[in-house]
């Protein structure tokens, strides 16, 4: 009888953590499930955006989301607002009776709404194409109506203090430095006689260049946890950026725009993600040319989502950050393009201009139409300032300089434009900074997620660094079968 009581007590306080999304073995689709004896929580629920066809991505997302029973989930905790961390959340409300509260950092709701609406629009459009092509009847993940339903469950919480969400669950947000309002999250689970703490990094910011990211809160380290579930997106030794490479790339941006736009009356397309990257690049351009009265080149922001998010930024930012943002947005050279007909007219005009248009990998959005116009023209230029997944259009252009044509949506386009690929503008923490941070955390185990095959080598190097500190923290490179018990 006594043994039976002890067994029951142990089960009652057991905590199981499973990385069920694409972040178990890849760099997108962040989703972690936390289960206790009576409760179920999710940390993030993002979209897998792999290097596959639209249909393959659809199937991958549906496969992982089926692992979640919507009616069981009580809280969904969000670290930051990129689509690969939040875009599948409304699917739970579309699939069944989900009443989970969605916990986000204070100030996030307006951006969350725009990201979900954009995701819904793109997915519904993609499903129409897939169904026509395959003569099938696939359902979209969710509709616009579902977005508004899910928004009713959103609850904003303050950072830098412990917030009790229930008798069992509390969290504390700490700045991650990745994008505006991005947070690490300390999750506290009360087991009765003891409390266990899990640190989730979400995505961490690039410390090397954080002083240049004027609209983003600086990264703050977390000192301890029972376990830490940490990203390792840029853990490769080959993918590093420093202040020195950043300075060189800033000089390159200036020289490219002066050469093509000022001297040759040509166009420079900068494919840019709507969230974070567009305001960041706009600020860079303003800092380079904003005080030059002779600089007359139009700066076009041609993306409906980017323009809506810029309005969100304007209402969220405060103090010096708000002042700097307003200064860049009021620059006389800036032209915001909303309507499709205005975008078509701008594309038809071959005169001097810099274009910021999404998406950054040329997978969707108006940047594809701009690419179709600019790529065949030897006088024009495409300037890439971010990572491109393998087999995306951006990747094919970067690696296809010897190809006479590039296929865009099934049609060949001449490949004549000048291509530049700048690599120092990553918003992710770099390899050595990750090692320095992770080895400083006092915890029992570190679980590496949100990384590719390079995380195995990174795991060994991190273990060596931890050992050099005379610490015994274990490091685990997560895979799709990893299950953590606390």
Please state what every model-predicted region is:
Residues 253-393, 449:
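Hard-cation-handling environments
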Residues 365-371, 426-441:
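A short, acidic, amphipathic alpha-helical segment used as a generic capping/interface helix at domain edges
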Residues 443-448:
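Proline-aspartate-enriched helix->loop->beta-strand connector
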Residues 406-434:
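Generic long, charged, amphipathic alpha-helical segments
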Residues 457-483:
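Short acidic, glycine/proline-enriched helix-loop-strand junctions
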Residues 1-7:
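Short, Lys/Arg-enriched N-terminal segments with co-localized hydrophobic residues
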Residues 34-37, 188-190, 215-220, 284-291, ...:
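Short, solvent-exposed amphipathic alpha-helical segments in soluble enzyme
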Residues 9-77, 82, 86, 93-280, ...:
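His/Asp/Glu-rich metal-coordinating catalytic cores
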């Amino acid at each position: 009888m006594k043994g039976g009581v002890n067994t029951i007590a142990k089960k009652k306080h057991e905590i199981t953590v499973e990385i069920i999304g694409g972040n178990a073995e890849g760099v997108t689709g962040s989703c972690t499930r936390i289960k206790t004896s009576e409760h179920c929580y999710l940390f993030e629920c993002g979209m897998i955006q792999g290097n596959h066809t639209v249909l393959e991505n659809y199937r991958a997302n549906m496969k992982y989301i089926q692992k979640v029973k919507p009616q069981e989930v009580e809280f969904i905790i969000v670290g930051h607002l990129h689509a690969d961390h939040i875009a599948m959340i409304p699917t739970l409300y579309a699939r069944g009776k989900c009443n989970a509260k969605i916990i986000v950092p204070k100030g996030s709701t307006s951006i969350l709404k725009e990201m979900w609406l954009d995701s819904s629009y793109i997915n519904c459009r993609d499903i129409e194409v897939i169904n026509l092509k395959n003569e099938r009847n696939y359902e979209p993940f969710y509709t616009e109506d579902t977005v508004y339903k899910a928004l009713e469950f959103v609850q904003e919480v303050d950072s830098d203090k412990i917030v009790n969400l229930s008798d069992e669950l509390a969290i504390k947000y700490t700045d991650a430095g990745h994008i505006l309002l991005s947070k690490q999250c300390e999750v506290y689970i009360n087991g009765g006689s003891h409390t266990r703490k899990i640190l989730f990094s979400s995505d961490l910011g690039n410390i090397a260049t954080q002083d240049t990211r004027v609209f983003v809160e600086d990264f703050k380290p977390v000192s301890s946890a029972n376990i830490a579930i940490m990203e390792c997106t840029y853990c490769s030794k080959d993918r590093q950026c420093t202040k020195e490479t950043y300075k060189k790339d800033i000089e390159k941006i200036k020289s490219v725009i002066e050469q093509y736009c000022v001297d040759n009356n040509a166009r420079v397309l900068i494919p840019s993600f709507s969230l974070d990257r567009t305001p960041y690049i706009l600020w860079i351009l303003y800092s380079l040319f904003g005080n030059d009265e002779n600089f007359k080149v139009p700066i076009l922001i041609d993306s409906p989502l980017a323009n809506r998010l810029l309005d969100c930024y304007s209402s969220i930012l405060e103090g010096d950050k708000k002042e700097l943002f307003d200064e860049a947005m009021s620059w006389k050279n800036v032209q915001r393009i909303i309507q499709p007909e205005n975008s078509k007219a701008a594309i038809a005009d071959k005169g001097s201009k810099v274009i910021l248009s999404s998406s950054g990998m040329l997978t969707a959005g108006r940047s594809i139409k701009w690419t179709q116009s600019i790529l065949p023209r030897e006088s024009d230029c495409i300037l890439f300032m971010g990572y491109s997944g393998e087999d995306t259009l951006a990747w094919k252009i970067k690696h296809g300089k010897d190809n006479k044509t590039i296929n865009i949506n099934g049609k060949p386009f001449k490949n004549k434009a000048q291509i530049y690929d700048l690599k120092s503008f990553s918003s992710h923490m770099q390899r050595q900074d990750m090692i320095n941070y992770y080895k400083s955390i006092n915890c029992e185990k570190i679980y590496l997620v949100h990384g590719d095959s390079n995380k195995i080598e990174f795991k060994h190097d991190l273990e060596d660094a931890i050992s050099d500190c005379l610490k015994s923290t274990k490091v685990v490179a997560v895979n799709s079968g990893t299950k953590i018990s606390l």
